[in-house]
Amino acid sequence: MATGKVVVEKVGGRSTATSCFSKYPLKFLLPSKAAPAGTDVVWIYSITYGGGIVSGDSISCEFTIGDGCTAVITTQSSTKVYKAIGSKCSEQILEARIGSEALLVVIPDPVTCFSTARYYQKQIFRLLSDSNLVLVDWITSGRHANGEKWDFEFYKSINNVYLEDDHPLFLDTVLLEKRSIQSIAERMQDYQAIAMVILFGAKLKEIQKQVQENVKNMMSEQLQLSYSSRRHKSESSSRNRFMKPEFIASCSTFGPEGKGVVVRIASDSTESVYNFLRQQLAELEPVLGQAPYA
């Protein structure tokens, strides 16, 4: 049985949560004033008791977003994954069905794994040809104040998007695992956060165009700065070393007729990722009633 389940349907012409269930360690908050009056959207805050996921916890969520509805799934703070007890793995499974002309926006705060933590996450989205989806999935390096940097044991995040009759549209897996040869921190170098953003659907067409253009311009500037710095260093020192950008983003399309856009990010700070998400998703404010990550 699922740990949590929410159904959003049209009632009297408005998006309404017609069913909401959750049990320990999960809790859903659906504030009625999350968006201004007149905004047709349901905001769903996913919360865990104790502010995090304990070793061995298993959370399973199901969301159904009916035809023409708009819903947001978010969090109040980062999802903390506490230290593992032995080989126990904390896991979180999310499955969502998005109806015709519906929009689901999944904009959580990042996952933060404590030292030795083991975490597995799988998110499955089932869409129709005219469904719309915004998905943000990201992780930080850990608790900086405690001197932890990519110090967890295991992290695996799967995001699968299916179209119509279970036709694979977008399949993605991120795996970070401790190895005896090279640690996660060594492989991640100085980057403190990695993120992925998915934008799919006709309702997001203009935002997709803007994000693609913004990422292109940002990375062009980064390359120019890196080249200038490299040239300056080569003139002043024979031991030239390429300067790694503090923020990297890439953008590509997927799906039929390029209806989907995926953005991948690596940054040396969590705050710069927050800033990027605020800027790129700001155009959603009229639809959602408030700007994501505001």
Curated annotation (Swiss-Prot):
Keywords linked to the UniProt accession: Chaperone, Nickel insertion
Ranges that cross the membrane: none
Record note on disruption phenotype: No visible phenotype under normal growth conditions, but mutant plants cannot grow on medium with urea as the sole source of nitrogen.
Gene Ontology molecular-function annotations: nickel cation binding
Single GO biological process annotation from the record: urea catabolic process
Gene Ontology CC: urease activator complex
Function summary: Required for the maturation and activation of urease via the functional incorporation of the urease nickel metallocenter.
Family: Belongs to the UreD family.
Name the UniProt record assigns to this protein: Urease accessory protein D
Organism listed in the record: Arabidopsis thaliana
Lineage, opening ranks: Eukaryota, Viridiplantae, Streptophyta, Embryophyta, Tracheophyta
Gene designation per UniProt: URED
